[in-house]
Amino acid sequence: MAEVEQKKKRTFRKFTYRGVDLDQLLDMSYEQLMQLYSARQRRRLNRGLRRKQHSLLKRLRKAKKDAPPMEKPEVVKTHLRDMIILPEMVGSMVGVYNGKTFNQVEIKPEMIGHYLGEFSITYKPVKHGRPGIGATHSSRFIPLK
């Protein structure tokens, strides 16, 4: 019985981005990272990050540094929906503006290479109710309340 319990210990899959694990990604330069990214992200990094993107990275670094050990860092709010998620951003909390409110997003390793805007939906998904009068030809026979 004791042997069975020892075998049930869960092992988690180690994260890799295109065959490179997270520790190696953090040590890479932007030029080496660009080789792993898709064409759109390569083009964006090749053209360079602007001042706003650099200030976001600076604020994220500061929030991570000021956070107590083993706790999540402070949320950093931003309107930069077009910011590409870089490996150094992993573990940060970002408030991404959706046009109305800031949606809190915790950056996970699986998000590397995606845009911040992909994780903050800008519209409210439709919740369809019952069809009204004139919705279809058969709806003429639906009794009114």
UniProtKB/Swiss-Prot annotation:
**HAMAP family reported for this sequence:** Ribosomal_uS19
- What's an example of a GO molecular-function annotation for this chain? structural constituent of ribosome
Coiled-coil annotated spans: none
Gene name linked to the record: RPS15
**Its Gene Ontology biological processes?**
positive regulation of signal transduction by p53 class mediator; ribosomal small subunit assembly; ribosomal small subunit export from nucleus; rRNA processing; translation
Q: Any signal peptide, and if so, which residues?
A: none
Does the record bear Ribosomal protein in its keywords?
Answer: yes
- Subunit description: Component of the small ribosomal subunit.
One Pfam family per UniProt = Ribosomal_S19
Keywords (alphabetical) are: Acetylation, Cytoplasm, Isopeptide bond, Ribonucleoprotein, Ribosomal protein, Ubl conjugation
Protein location? Cytoplasm
The entry's cellular-component GO terms read:
cytosolic small ribosomal subunit
Q: What does this protein do?
A: Component of the small ribosomal subunit. The ribosome is a large ribonucleoprotein complex responsible for the synthesis of proteins in the cell.
Query: Which family does the entry's similarity section mention?
Result: Belongs to the universal ribosomal protein uS19 family.
Question: Ribosomal protein among the record's keywords?
Answer: yes
Cross-link Glycyl lysine isopeptide (Lys-Gly) (interchain with G-Cter in SUMO2): give the residues.
K108
N-acetylalanine occurs at which residues? A2
Entries under InterPro entries matching the protein: Ribosomal_uS19, Ribosomal_uS19_CS, Ribosomal_uS19_euk/arc, Ribosomal_uS19_SF
**Where is this chain primarily localised?**
cytoplasm
Entry protein name: Small ribosomal subunit protein uS19
Name the domain of life. Answer: Eukaryota
